[in-house]
Amino acid sequence: MTDTPTKQEIQSKNDNVPAATPVEQKKNNRNDRKRNRRGDSKNLERDSDWQERVVQIRRVSKTVKGGKKMSFRAIVVVGNEKGQVGVGVGKAGDVIGAVRKGVSDGKKNLVRVPLTPNNSIPTLSLGSDGAANVLIRPAAPGTGVIAGGSIRTVLELAGIKNVLAKRLGSKTPLNNARAAMVALSQLRTHKSVSRERGISLEQLYS
């Protein structure tokens, strides 16, 4: 039968194991700090590409059993000015929380916009949401963004520099922003249209 080691023998073996030196601990701490800095810098680069603009903040109330519950509603437009834009709505008990929820909601509802070399849109488009209708059409270089209100914010954060927009119907900021998003989502490039119709670009322009 083999002799089982006693507690004193096990303790003596553990005592003989060399512990990490202070120099090694410092090196490990430095490596961990470098990794954390790299991760933070990557996250900052990703977040720096996106811009956020608050279109409207309203104080709303909800009738519950105990009375009225007050909260804030924020309409936020998020975009990277490179062809991606989104509109979000957030509700919270404070303004900062409502804006934060609106930003996260806007990033969940992003739309890709095909941009021309002149930072305009390829074709005319009409979008509607509720009683709001928004008409957007391409413009020549140097025209700028001819739009107002929440429609202008959506177009600017999408990266469009030359465009004409017309608001038809309702004047509410949320409906107009969503109508502009619908109009942008319906845009298609000339190549995609010619591919769907089975004709060349020359035949499409003629």
UniProtKB/Swiss-Prot annotation:
Highest taxon, organism lineage: Bacteria
GO molecular function: rRNA binding; structural constituent of ribosome
GO BP terms in the entry: translation
Any single Gene Ontology cellular-component annotation: small ribosomal subunit
Bias type Basic and acidic residues, positions: 38-50
Span list, region Disordered: 1-50
Protein's UniProt keywords contain Ribosomal protein: yes
Domain annotation S5 DRBM: ranges: 50-113
Key words of the record: Ribonucleoprotein, Ribosomal protein, RNA-binding, rRNA-binding
Biased composition (Polar residues): 1-15
NCBIfam families (UniProt xref): rpsE_bact (TIGR01021)
Record's subunit section: Part of the 30S ribosomal subunit. Contacts proteins S4 and S8.
Record comment regarding domains: The N-terminal domain interacts with the head of the 30S subunit; the C-terminal domain interacts with the body and contacts protein S4. The interaction surface between S4 and S5 is involved in control of translational fidelity.
Family, as annotated: Belongs to the universal ribosomal protein uS5 family.
Cited function: With S4 and S12 plays an important role in translational accuracy.
PANTHER family reported in the protein's UniProt record: MITOCHONDRIAL RIBOSOMAL PROTEIN S5 (PTHR48277:SF1)
Protein name listed in UniProt: Small ribosomal subunit protein uS5
Native source organism of the sequence: Prochlorococcus marinus (strain AS9601)
Lineage, uppermost ranks: Bacteria, Bacillati, Cyanobacteriota, Cyanophyceae, Synechococcales
